[in-house]
């Protein structure tokens, strides 16, 4: 058995971590075993990030991303499990479409993975729930990339079906009736934020929680971008996630980002961003997930009403959070909880998310003092850009998936990622 010696855990304790193949055998002091890594009480060791919200674009949009490129980017960013969303081509609204996507993931992903099922008027719940779905969603309450927005009746039906199958429903919560159509006369980059209002999110969260509760479904709100949305989710007993772009960017950044800062839901005012970050720090936000949604530079360079929505983020999420922890803005315990422990608990991943005996050895080693600027040219996504250009992050020195080194600080290694639901 191999030992990581004198690792600093998220809570500051210095412990040995002994690995037995793919699993953690023990966490303690003075553990016997072959020395694997001497952390020397300098390196922090965290459980690998579970990114419950990525768009790896395959099948259908491989020029933007593939399972190979997206999972390499994940590994280099300390992400050991990814969950792909349904809006590919074909969308994963049938069992056959899930099988097709899962085959790509099984062949090419170097991290563990899950596939979500989607809901449209053409969905086939019988075949869909016959597959090993990670969750149902994101279910779109307003149109986004892929035109998968659904009406209230179909959402209610989807919640009832998911409840009967004991599958979590993840929700893209925006109410199109609350969009400000007056903003459509504008052509500046901020027009998108003005159009898709904060009120649209809060109203949709309240509606989603109400319908989900009536149906007996477990509701998780995706990419919550406003403090009001977080509060509405909590009030209704739902869990929620926030993204790095909503935590670290605001409408103030749109002068520099232009259409590269268009996403759904959009960037909010800086006071709202600060209030969202406060909810991250104090525990009201359950999960950080990236909504990694890459597009090419050429695609994003269109005008604000034609540019596709979405930004990459799977490689920079954990580094940005670790940078915030290094600056004292966030505790390492919160980083651990929102990136690993909580996603594992919310989605029932019994082998993931915790550094404990019997869990998968999904681990990230970081030197907390090794902060550096983020540059798109250094990242591994096919899209080759980042909205966080020039921001400071702390990147992993090593990433392990089930005990195998998939990132050594310089190179991504081959590895057969597995479906976490099988």
Curated annotation (Swiss-Prot):
Organism placement in taxonomy: Archaea, Methanobacteriati, Methanobacteriota, Stenosarchaea group, Halobacteria
CC per GO annotation: cytoplasm
Top EC group: hydrolase
InterPro entries given in the database record: Amidohydro-rel, DHOase, DHOase/Allantoinase_Hydrolase, Dihydroorotase_CS, Metal-dep_hydrolase_composite, Metal_Hydrolase
Cofactor note: Binds 2 Zn(2+) ions per subunit.
UniProt xrefs under Pfam families: Amidohydro_1 (PF01979)
Positions that bind Zn(2+) 2: 138, 172, 223
Pathway connected to this protein: Pyrimidine metabolism; UMP biosynthesis via de novo pathway; (S)-dihydroorotate from bicarbonate: step 3/3
Organism: Halobacterium salinarum (strain ATCC 700922 / JCM 11081 / NRC-1) (Halobacterium halobium)
GO terms (BP aspect): 'de novo' UMP biosynthetic process; purine nucleobase catabolic process
Binding site for substrate: 55-57, 87, 295
Catalysis performed (reactions): (S)-dihydroorotate + H2O = N-carbamoyl-L-aspartate + H(+)
Domain of life of the organism encoding this protein: Archaea
Names of required cofactors: Zn(2+)
Molecular functions per Gene Ontology: allantoinase activity; dihydroorotase activity; zinc ion binding
Listed Gene3D superfamilies: Metal-dependent hydrolases, Urease, subunit C, domain 1
Keywords assigned: Hydrolase, Metal-binding, Pyrimidine biosynthesis, Zinc
Protein name: Dihydroorotase
Gene: pyrC
Binding site for Zn(2+) 1: 53, 55, 138, 291
Family: Belongs to the metallo-dependent hydrolases superfamily. DHOase family. Class I DHOase subfamily.
Active site residues of this protein: 291
